[in-house]
């Protein structure tokens, strides 16, 4: 078992074993984010679902109002005039069969892959390469589309795709430690609303089990998710 560093143990000692009010939890994580770089803020949500059943799977997108603070490299598989359209809209990579061939060889210098529907039969053959990395385009995630300009701009502006892992936990980055606490709270609230709005039809019993927020190098802080749900956007 890996040892906890003295620094992390020291920081964790400042945190009480209880669920904090949302803004208080965010402020506490920000205070402990003292690495030499701008740490990423992360939310980890344990849900009462069993993703091995198709009606208990969660996969969707969220458009964070204040963005993520991270740049996203986008690749687009399309054809014809849409290759130039994708590049003009801000995609770092765009191509036809040539890009599919590069990806099949493991050349994946991108964070997100978008495809037009006519190219999905070719992209689908890349499942062994894209699947384990969570990069396979999906209509529900907005990454299979003919409106490339809108999709690219949305993802560049902070739209994120996320899913529950096989244990029913959602892991989402929701900003940077340099963001104001209010901006981070707005992002976290939007994430909570998205998770609630996309509750799987087969979910049984208590849907939310726990919510923790943390930063890249900091300790986790439990959040009172009921208090988060009670917050009205704009309040």
From Swiss-Prot:
Pfam families listed in its UniProt record: Ribosomal_L1
GO molecular function term, any single one: rRNA binding
CDD domains named among the record's database cross-references: Ribosomal_L1 (cd00403)
Coiled coil: none
GO biological process, one term: translation
GO cellular component: large ribosomal subunit
Classification via InterPro entries: Ribosom_uL1_bac-type, Ribosomal_uL1, Ribosomal_uL1-like, Ribosomal_uL1/biogenesis, Ribosomal_uL1_3-a/b-sand, Ribosomal_uL1_CS
SUPFAM superfamilies for the chain: Ribosomal protein L1 (SSF56808)
Keywords of this entry: Repressor, Ribonucleoprotein, Ribosomal protein, RNA-binding, rRNA-binding, Translation regulation, tRNA-binding
Family from the record: Belongs to the universal ribosomal protein uL1 family.
Assembly behavior: Part of the 50S ribosomal subunit.
Function text: Binds directly to 23S rRNA. The L1 stalk is quite mobile in the ribosome, and is involved in E site tRNA release.
HAMAP family: Ribosomal_uL1_B
Annotated protein name in UniProt: Large ribosomal subunit protein uL1
Gene name linked to the record: rplA
